[in-house]
Amino acid sequence: MTEPSGGEGGLRNGLRRLLRPSSVAVIGASDDPASIGGAPISLLERFGFPGEVHLVSRSRARIGSRPCLRSIDDLPYGVDAAVLAIPRAGVLEAVEAAARRGVGGVVVFASGYGELGPAGRSDEEALAEAARLGGVALAGPNCLGLVNFVDAAPLTFAHAVPNWQAAERGVAVVAQSGALSMALTYAALAQGVMVTYAISTGNEAVAGVEDYLELVLEDECTGAVAMLVEQVRQPSKILALARTAAKKGVALCLLHTGRSARAREASLTHTGAIAGNQAVLRAALDREGILLVDSLDELVDAAGILARYGPPSSPGIAFMTDSGAAKTHALDLAQDLGLDLPSLADATLDRLGRELPSFATAGNPVDITAMGLNDPGLYARVAGSLLDDPSVGSLVVAAMPGSDRQGTEQVDALLPTLSGASKPVIYTIMGGDWPLPEANRSRILDAGVPLLRSPERALRAAGHLAHLAERRAPAAERVRPVRLDLPEGVVLGEPAAKDILRSLGLRVPAGSLARDAAEAKSLADRLGYPVVLKAVSPELRHKSDAGAVGFVHHADDLAASYESLLRRLERARPALVLEGVLVEEMVRGGVEVLLGARRDPDWGPYLVVGLGGIFTEVLGDAVVLMADAGPAEITEALTGLRGFPLLEGARGSAPGDLPALVAAVQRVGAAILGSPTIAEIEVNPLLVLPCGLGAVALDALVVGIGGTPREG
């Protein structure tokens, strides 16, 4: 990605002219409104674009009432935006001509660039260089264009775009996919969500998602941003913009595609993106308050609701229905989704007790029963009681429609309460589209009340709101870097790595390195039995896989165990250069944990903590944090482990020393954060002993930048 001359400021100014133009040129203009060269003209007219429109066509003197120019060089100087609706072969020349005429920015629809591989990337780089030298912002190539619904400026060939006029805070859509940028836009509009911008970034030869995000955040009409990306190309910029958005009260929602191996392969041929480390990306974005979702529906739902309300003040969700089965289903969904349906205040329960029929039970979720069909006001009274509860941050109302008359009465009763709520409310009328009269649907959407068509979808959306509410807490304390000097290319085996850990304040077992069986016997006798024998080599990363670990319970067994270990190692790794055998005290009891720290080329230093020790990869139970995570953030992340109950003392076992584990994670994070020559630190396993007894690093490896330990 390259920038126009003038650097970042020049790119930003050119993109601003492109996104909010007062004059537009269509290059390759056609009189066929269904063609790529005709659709932009038709859309500009249908939207009522208030600025100047210039047409360039080599085959037409006029299109409709507008005259056509023969070439870009005939354009008046300083047109803000040019749409290049021409074949790929003429695009480079057109960009150079646009630069000569002072055009602010160009939209390139043509494909056949970086998404095709090396040859295409070379052409894309030439295109980007021409734009940079000419000071022209460039959208695309291989994009569907941009639609500014605020200023009625559609620069796209997407025929179905409605001439929607955004007049209040809404959702800006920014996507690396043209088709999905429009799909998200149509879905949002169908839900009554105000869309302010729909931006397809394409191959991002010059401008990326982050650059457009910066611009839409300037607009007071932007209440939320829905982003769909295959690759975040400017990590530091998107994190900085997340902080800017938080200050402005704008919610950022992101769907990251290309997570699977096959999807990453497909993305190479789709937009030229190489998907980054998904877990690290999620950790970095989440901690800055960017809401990560897993589907297009979730993206539309969350962004639309957040644009309307912003994040709730509390993560608690109240669920109200007129069906006992729906109440039970909501409890199941809440458990599956990890949602908090809090207990209600006594005052709320008293109110509900007075409002509900005698055979209904006050609580959360609450089933008002079918009495709501006979007494529509019951819906509103119960909803009002729930919204007044201090533990409730958002409300889901899941109702059956009844007959057309009953459904209308339900809507009549609920709308004043729901539309006037300051807390997020989500209305779901169960049964899909069939039982909901269009008039009622329109009234709900016109009142600004989010309408989703299933309890599951509503609860998923509410869960996303709850997650953001938890993130609204004051920024947690972050760790201070600790610098360690390690030569580049060095790989420290276990004894030296444990010296590093000891200097950081981690506890390691007592032990020393032996060069032969006699020395091992002498060391073991001094330590006291039982002891552990471990082969030591920087090339030996997974000792247990190579049979390089032995356990000795009695002095008489030491020599035989020593020789047996060497024989196993000779069979498994005959070329291994051995430094010696580490003799250590045996530490038993507790829970084994993997603690690792690494550097991601995009996101920087990060931590991995997983239960299972050497079996962590098999169990797949691990969390990722950024390396500067403080104690509160680490503790919260650990509770997300499926096996966290083991640390709490499951099935009568003693609870683990969680503070000691948190301290160890924090100290390793400080080391990778402050030591630029360290590529990786791994403690595996870290044995978390019962509460008050600490945590012990049983094995360790430290790798310098450029170091390459072999697997074994």
Predicted regions and their residues:
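Catalytic-core regions of core metabolic enzymes
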Residues: 1-712
